[in-house]
Amino acid sequence: MKTGSCEQTELDLKQALSGLPIGGVHYFETIGSTNDYGFKCAEAGAPDMTVITAFEQTAGRGRMHRKWITVPGTSLPMTVIIRPKSEEIEHLNLFSPLTGLAVREALAAGWGIESEIKWPNDVLLNRKKICGILCEILWEGDRMKSLILGLGTNLLHGAAPEIPDLTYPASSVEDETGIVISRPDWIRHFLEQLIRLRPLIGTPGFYTLWEKSLAYKEETVTLVRPDGTAERGTVKGIDSERNLIVINPAGQIRTYLAGEISLRPV
């Protein structure tokens, strides 16, 4: 059952998002996973651009089954249900970077904050991770029914607990810039940019924006495979299949699929 404070927060959020072409808002004080709830909503027929968010998420997850830690009130978990249009079906693998671009553009448009996207889709601020993204698919038999876009954004101080041995140290927008962003303001700015950028998906303009946002471009990085072996190379860009383009020390051009390697700074 929702508490009064939860009802008030949901009302405030709906007011903040009024006028946006979204399919509805679901807010929780505490939830296991916004993506898991997104699956349930999608299975029940929730419309395109339905938004799920919470004050606290207790069972969040990231790519490669990694645990995503959400500190209550400081990190904002959110899921958006996407019902892809016919022309978007061939570009489903681009919705994850689209989400990263929407985060980047929201920070820039709303607060003048410049961030980068670490291939394939983490958002970095001062080379520290402030947003992670997990895009999942709901299948009905062999038919794709909907996309579940999940993201966790570290907004306020305390959102990134100190964890040893992280490849990319986590941080928050407030810690890196001193700027305090309210949850309703953040959600509105993000959704505005997601709506604005969505028609660009798969177009030359989409790839241009992604390249412009790419972290470590023209820099030497370490590319680590799942088995632990690694090599170095210079990041050159992204091809039309979403692959990372790298030149190795021998001068050979190599491309890598998302999930095939992990990118780490030297």
Ranges and model annotations:
Residues M1-A109, I253:
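N-terminal lobe of the biotin/lipoate ligase/transferase fold
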Residues M1-C6, P21, K85-E90, L94-S115, ...:
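Long, positively charged amphipathic alpha-helical accessory segments at protein N-termini or as interdomain linkers
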